[in-house]
Amino acid sequence: MSEMLFFVITTIVKAVVILAVMASLAGLATYAERKVLAYMQRRVGPDMVGPAGVLQIVADMIKLFTKEDIVPANANKFIFLIAPLISAIAAFAALAPVPFLPEFEVFGHTIRPILADINVGVLYIAGVAAVCVFSPLAAGLASYNKFALISAARAVVALLSFEVVAGMALLSVVMVTSSLSLVDINNYQKGIFNWLIFKQPLAFVLFVMASFVECNRTPFCLTENETEIVAGYGTEYSGMRWAMFFIGEYTNMIAASIIITLLFLGGFNEFLFIPGALMIILKSSLVFFFFLWTRASWPHLRVDQLSMLCWKILLPLGILNVVITGFALLI
């Protein structure tokens, strides 16, 4: 088998595997969130379908597949129908330059668990994250619903504000590692004292907060605040189109957990006797748990509080961090 043919086959296989695994994990994440929140609130959570309620995911999937797909009479049908697709596609597209595991060999061929090892992976992820704003915006505008429209406006304010903060955090990482490749950034962090969480703690905090906004999670969950705007931009959606928004949201959470691990927590480098593959799974799981923990612990912020936090506090801190990093590299 020629190298080119092997490359094409492995790329197709990797794309299918990544899509299947991430879609399955997104479903499992909904179950994990419900159980974690139930435990923290002294409830039982899902427990009726299957052992410990684990088959609740299958029951929910069957329910959503069999629900009627309703389009409001006054909605812009084309935009209304493609908005959920934008959410899911953008979430999966962000995974292309992410190295999930260390490389390994199969029949003498080296397999790299990454779909596209591009040398501008960080820039690519920032670009795809910027595209995510079009999904709630399109859904809110096309739904012809006041709650959806307010939610869309909130989404634009939140996402555009924190894109700048995330950019400042990523710029600090790139300055330290001298690379835009996630593989190079991972390789830079060999040894626990080289983890960028210790060299760039402020950038870590800024990027985590920006990830919460990107994933629409508490305390920055302004677009789906049930007590104010019902279900936000998804109010008029039903069935699998409604589910696609949440597949995109939970895929974003999983992707953000992996990216945070690669950028700041040593990635898949080995630690003591723990192999690299297990390390990235453990660290990403802890970051994902942190997403769930905050939902059970923190209240929502108002829109004006979010904007003030971003533009008056976090952005100046991000710029200051970049300046200090630049001076430190020159010395």
Swiss-Prot record:
What subcellular compartments does it reside in? Answer: Cell inner membrane
Name the top EC class: translocase
Q: Which parts of the chain span the membrane according to its record? A: 5-25, 45-65, 78-98, 122-142, 156-176, 192-212, 245-265, 271-291, 311-331
- Give the InterPro entries listed for this entry: NADH_UbQ_OxRdtase_su1/FPO (IPR001694), NADH_UbQ_OxRdtase_su1_CS (IPR018086)
Keywords tagged on the record: Cell inner membrane, Cell membrane, Membrane, NAD, Quinone, Translocase, Transmembrane, Transmembrane helix, Ubiquinone
GO annotation, biological process: aerobic respiration
Main localization category: membrane
What this protein catalyses is: a quinone + NADH + 5 H(+)(in) = a quinol + NAD(+) + 4 H(+)(out)
Query: What Enzyme Commission number(s) does the record list for this chain?
Result: 7.1.1.-
Extract one GO molecular function annotation from the record: NADH dehydrogenase activity
Q: Which domain of life does the protein's organism represent?
A: Bacteria
GO CC annotation: what is one? Answer: plasma membrane
- PROSITE patterns registered for this protein in UniProt: COMPLEX1_ND1_1
Q: What does the function comment of this entry state?
A: NDH-1 shuttles electrons from NADH, via FMN and iron-sulfur (Fe-S) centers, to quinones in the respiratory chain. The immediate electron acceptor for the enzyme in this species is believed to be ubiquinone. Couples the redox reaction to proton translocation (for every two electrons transferred, four hydrogen ions are translocated across the cytoplasmic membrane), and thus conserves the redox energy in a proton gradient. This subunit may bind ubiquinone.
Q: Its quaternary structure?
A: NDH-1 is composed of 14 different subunits. Subunits NuoA, H, J, K, L, M, N constitute the membrane sector of the complex.
Protein family (similarity comment) = Belongs to the complex I subunit 1 family.
Q: What is this protein called?
A: NADH-quinone oxidoreductase subunit H
- Organism of origin is Campylobacter concisus (strain 13826)
